[in-house]
Every structure is written in C-alpha cells, then in structure tokens.
Swiss-Prot record:
Motif ('KMSKS' region): 240-244
Binding site for ATP: 243
Lineage: Bacteria, Pseudomonadati, Pseudomonadota, Gammaproteobacteria, Chromatiales
Compositional bias annotation for Basic and acidic residues: 112-130
Gene transcribed to yield this protein: gltX2
Subcellular location: Cytoplasm
Protein name, entry field: Glutamate--tRNA ligase 2
Residues that coordinate or bind Zn(2+): 99, 101, 126, 128
Length: 472
RNA sequence: GUCCCCAUCGUCUAGCUGGCCUAGGACACCACCCUUUCAAGGUGGCGACACGGGUUCGAAUCCCGUUGGGGACGCCA
C-alpha cells in the first residue's frame, strides 16, 4: 500500500475562494487521516491573470485556516522543461500532432456547429497531415492530443462510482499553445504524475475533464490516480457560489469575525456528515472524515448556519484562544487591551453573547473606553426620577467596599434594591447604562468587577450628575 | 444543442444493504419557561421524501420515464 499523496492546486487569479477552501479541506483531512503527504501546487500557466498578490492571498488563507502543506508550493511556470519533455515524448510517439488551424477558422467551425445544434468540437483537420496545409495557416501551430476515436473510457470515482464517457464525445484537445506553453489538462496530468499524487480530490466541474486526462496518463505510460469529484457549493439562487452571493473569500470571513475552526466545521458539513453531529473540532475531523461518505448533490451556502457554528466554537473555546483572535479587532478600533481589564477575562464574560468576533469587539469597547453618550432609548427608559439617588447610593457603597469582587458588588445591588424598595432591575439596569452606555452587557456584578472600582465609581457619579441635569 | 452529474422540511442533513419511517436531528422562524439586561440553556410548535408509472405482500429506499437543478463543450484553470 503506497503512501497517500494528495494536492491542492489553486490558480492564483484571485483570493482563496470558499469553494477552493472546501476542496483543500477535504484533501487535507483525507491526507491527515491516512498519514499521507499534502502537496501545494500553484497553477499559474495563465500568465495574464496570475498575480503575486493572488498567490499571497491564497497562502495567507491557507495559513489562517491551518491547512498546512508538506511539500511545495510548486509553481507550474517553473516546470516548463518538464512539460516540454513530455510533449516531445507524445509527438515522437505520434500521440500528439501540430495543428495549424487559425483562431478564425476554429471560431467559424464552432459557430457553424452550434447553428446545426451540434456539440462544438474540433473537426480533426490537421490530425493526419504531414506538414502545414495549403491555406488558412496559423503563424504558430498549437499541439493537440490524438484522442481515440472509438470505444469509451470509465472514470472510477470514490463518490460517484463508475462514470462512462464515449470517446466519440471527446475531441483532440490543445495541450500546448503556439508559444509552446502547455495548457491546463496537460500540466495537471504531468504534475500529478511527477509529484506522485495518488488521490485527486477536486470539484465535480472537473469530472468532464477526467476522461481526457485518463487518456493522457495512459499515453504517457502511467496508471491514473484515484479520483473523488466533490459536489459544488451553490449560492442562494442555485448557481455556483460567486461574489453576487456575498462573501466568497476565506479572508473576508476572517475579517468579519469568524474563527478558522468554525469555517472549517461549516465547510466540512456542507457535503459530508457523521450521523446528526454538527459541531466538530479539527482533530476530531481528522479521525472521522471519510471521503467515501461525501454526498453526491450540491449544497447551498447558508450564512445563518455558519454564524451559529461560529457561536458554538466561540463558546467552547479557551478564552486565551479567543483573546488572541479578538486582539486585532480591538486594535482596529483604536483600543489597547493593556490599558484596561485583562482581555481573557473580558472574553470569559462575553463568550456566550457574541456570534462573531466583530460583535464581541463592539460589545467590549466600553471596558476600555468611557462611553461618550448614553443610548437615547436606554437612558430614557432607565434614567428616571429617583435614579440619581440610587446611583449615588451605590456609588457611595462601592467606594466603601472592603474588596472589589462580583460577590460584594452583587451585595450592594441587592441591598440598594431593598433600601429603595424596588426590584433588582431598577438598580441593575441604571448601573448598566451608566457604565456601558447601553442596556446590554454581561451580568452587572461581573461587568463592574472587570471595570474596576475607580472607573466604576467615576462613571456612576457622572451618570448621576447627568440624570440630575437631564431628568425631571 | 450534445454529453456528464444530481433531486428528503426555507437551508444543512440522518435514513438508500426494501419492513424498524404516522421520515429523525441541526440551523432559521414562532411560542412558553428560566432570568435585572443581552445572550446562553430548557420545553413545545411550524415544516420534506419533485411528479408519474413499474417491481413487490410492502418503496424515501430498487427499475423506467418525465420535470426541475448543476456542470462541461476556452489556445482559462
């Protein structure tokens, strides 16, 4: 049994797409489960659309997700010698030939075939020529692969079983351009061969490329690898997921406050399941994931479920883990956690009440920055006649507490409620608005403990003064 | 147009080795409980086997057809 070797082979024409990330995830999990090797290859033969920025975005996305690779990244543009060698092998064996057709001729051919309601395909004009034809000759000929004309090819797929394609449906695909550079279907075969890839896991939009590639493997004298074509991810309109459906870049989800493990959890469940279990850790997934259990049908991306999973992972994580991911969001808001309560402690109070890190950062600002104003509705509802006396009472009691902890603070609040003959909410809510500026915060005792005695006393006094000046 | 893939609640899914399915779970939505707030949690509700035919004592499950959806048909990947 040879070692399993898989690969992720993105084209650097943009960011790391959600769909690509899911493909990478399935390959990565399959590899890790079986103790294999995960190869990263950058397919950049499209010189016009590939950019270094896109390469960096892909590498950054992979790193953020934690999808580490064992080999590479290999760049296809650095392997042209290898492709040339294999091209020459096919030419020498008569398995490939030069095609002198002009682009104009091919375009006309395609248009005529479509007018006849036929499948557009190369008509084989140069297939058996010894040299250039007498007319309509391209300046630089391309190289085409000599596809068998009869019979069929079977794709054995780990997810779909055997899928059969008639050779008469295929045509002689271009494997090298006029400038000599190879095209995708050729490079992918050569690379997977030379990199010893044993399992190709990719989107099922490539299922129809596979019969051509199997012919190429066989022409080069090799057995094809195992294939698993995983279903697409669709947008809400049922089409392939794209920008018009919202965020589709992995790093965009990072920026919107998602944890990498939450996104991975969501993506793995979009097509794979393990009974009714919904929440998985990455280590757990490595143990459980089985490529043969991936579903056949495409799934629709649903941000609502992803948000819930993010909430589940936030709640279950160690506070220091969340604190590390939260720090950059506070920095973006001009906040230095060193100037206030320990961020880990803040996270502990907020973990059950935020679906994203963006939300958690926004809701935690008041710990580090005195609110400049009170929410109008919250103030109107909770700052009433009599509130100033309650706040000043609490302020005084807070100042005299022997120790500043949640239990002592809770005692002050319940004592004040008794002293003023009101329910606890009539004390807690004004305190909440006073220190946070809003009607929402963690439990008031924990909130005030974190804020500190000095800052609490100052904010409560300030609010009492505001009430005297603005209420009644 | 040709070929390939696919079809269970609004979304993700369990179930597909016929009987255990008056099809279960999660998310979302609605209601109630808990509760100083927001959440979390608990309980309940709403909600699906695309349609037709066949095989069978019996079909979500097997077969055929229709319908609908996705993909490929680039000198992109």
């Amino acid at each position: 049994m040879t070692m399993i070797r898989t690969r992720f082979a993105p084209s650097p024409t943009g960011y790391l797409h959600i769909g690509g990330a899911r493909t990478a995830l399935y390959s990565w999990l399959h590899t890790r489960r079986h103790g294999g090797r995960f190869v990263l290859r950058i397919e950049d033969t499209d010189r016009e659309r590939s950019t270094p920025e896109a390469v960096n975005a892909i590498l950054e996305g992979m790193a953020w997700l934690g999808l580490d690779y064992d080999e590479g990244p290999f760049y296809q543009t650095e392997r042209y010698d290898r492709y040339r060698q294999h091209l020459q092998t096919l030419l020498d064996a008569g398995q490939a030939y030069y095609c002198y057709c002009t682009k104009d001729r091919l375009e006309r051919l395609r248009t005529e075939q479509q007018a006849r309601k036929e499948k557009p395909r190369y008509d084989g004009r140069c297939r058996d020529l010894d040299g250039p034809p007498s007319e309509e000759v391209a300046d630089e000929p391309v190289i085409r692969f000599r596809t068998p004309l009869e019979g069929h090819v079977v794709v054995e797929d780990a997810i779909r079983g055997k899928v059969q394609f008639l050779n008469s449906e295929l045509d002689d695909l271009v494997i090298a351009r006029g400038d000599g550079s190879p095209t995708y279907n050729f490079t992918v075969v050569v690379d997977d061969l030379e990199m010893g890839v044993t399992d190709v896991i990719r989107g099922d939009d490539h299922l129809n490329n596979t019969p051509r590639q199997i012919h190429l493997y066989q022409a080069l004298g090799f057995e094809p690898p195992r294939f698993a074509h995983v279903p697409m991810i669709l947008g809400e309109d049922g089409k392939r997921l794209s920008k018009r459906h919202g965020s589709v870049s992995v790093l965009q989800y990072r920026d919107e406050g998602y944890l990498p493990e939450a996104l991975l959890n969501y993506l793995v469940r979009l097509g794979w399941s393990h009974g009714d279990q919904e929440v998985f850790g990455v280590d757990e997934l490595i143990q459980l994931f089985d490529i043969n259990e991936v579903n056949h049908s495409a799934s629709t991306f649903n941000p609502s479920k992803l948000q819930w999973l993010n909430q589940q992972h936030i709640m279950r994580a160690e506070p220091n883990h969340i604190a590390r991911h939260l720090g950059p969001f506070l920095a973006e808001r001009g906040v230095d956690p060193a100037e206030g309560p320990a961020l880990e402690a803040v996270v502990r109070t907020q973990q059950e009440r935020a679906k994203t890190l963006v939300e958690m950062a926004d809701n935690s600002l008041f710990f580090y920055r005195r609110p400049e104003a009170y929410e109008e509705k919250a103030a109107r509802k909770n700052f009433k006649e009599g509130t100033a006396e309650i706040l000043e009472h609490c302020q005084h009691c807070f100042s005299g507490l022997p120790s500043w902890d949640a239990e002592s603070i809770h005692g002050v609040v319940t004592e004040a409620a008794e002293a003023f003959d009101v329910k606890m909410g009539k004390v807690a809510q004004p305190l909440r608005v006073a220190v946070s500026g809003s009607a929402v915060s963690p439990p008031i005792d924990a909130t005030l403990e974190l804020l500190g005695r000095e800052e609490t006393v100052a904010r409560v006094g300030q609010a009492a003064e505001w009430v005297r000046q603005n209420v009644g």
